[in-house]
Amino acid sequence: MPRQAASRLVVGEGEGPPGASGPAATMLRSLLLHSLRLCAQTASCLVLFPRFLGTAFMLWLLDFLCIRKHFLRRRHPDHPEPEVELNSEGEEMPPDDPPICVSDDNRLCTLASLKAVWHGQKLDFFKQAHEGGPAPNSEVVRPDGFQSQRILDYAQGTRPLVLNFGSCTUPPFMARMSAFQRLVTKYQRDVDFLIIYIEEAHPSDGWVTTDSPYVIPQHRSLEDRVSAARVLQQGAPGCALVLDTMANSSSSAYGAYFERLYVIQSGTIMYQGGRGPDGYQVSELRTWLERYDEQLHGTRPRRL
């Protein structure tokens, strides 16, 4: 009897509970998945790091006022001197892309600025949107009622849909809003326009700049984002305005931080503007709209 009991004990220990390999296999798969993600993030950091270092070095140089004044006054060779435009009363209109102004008391190379630059470059690197490719149908939120929608819900048939990403604390975005408003007024018969309010470029508790026209902290909730968007809506053109989600899904999909312009037509990205502040050029959008209008109506439009 003792031998039989001992043998039964040994056999019982060797069998183990049924399905014991299930949790182990799940844990192994999870470990492999996390390892792959870590490798992908490490590889992306290695690719982005030289670009980030170059930007950080440029910001450090621009903290020397003599360099800042010389560099910011110099016009980029790809952006020729703009044409002088007159309104109906013969008065000179402001340019589409006024030069970026940075006050002397603003430091550009700080921990907060480097965090913001890294965040923007990372979003641009991982964005889903590319010119000529399909437009990401990311989630947006209506400011009235917090109703969830999709970006392509605002596209109507084959009409182009212009996306304008930005926030109140972004000086170039706000400085060029009047030029964007002129385009909305001129082309809204054939083109749809949508402003997407994203996370603040220069929140009062982040990368602070005295050049920002408003003092707004980072959004902690959709209510905060709605309050900021209403400030923009007071002086915004007569086009639809929606909010990015608190997960920043649209800004991530389009690499839109700090600000950016896109044109979507029939679900395809027809124009992808550069990432702000340097690449945010309303004049480029105007050129695209003029060409589209010429193709549509056969005559070159007169500038406002």
Curated annotation (Swiss-Prot):
The keyword Transmembrane helix applies. Keywords: Cell membrane, Endosome, Membrane, Oxidoreductase, Selenocysteine, Signal-anchor, Thyroid hormones biosynthesis, Transmembrane, Transmembrane helix. Neonatal skin, placenta, skeletal muscle and cerebral cortex. Residues 1-42 are cytoplasmic. Its EC number is 1.21.99.3. Pfam families: T4_deiodinase. PROSITE patterns: T4_DEIODINASE. This is Thyroxine 5-deiodinase.
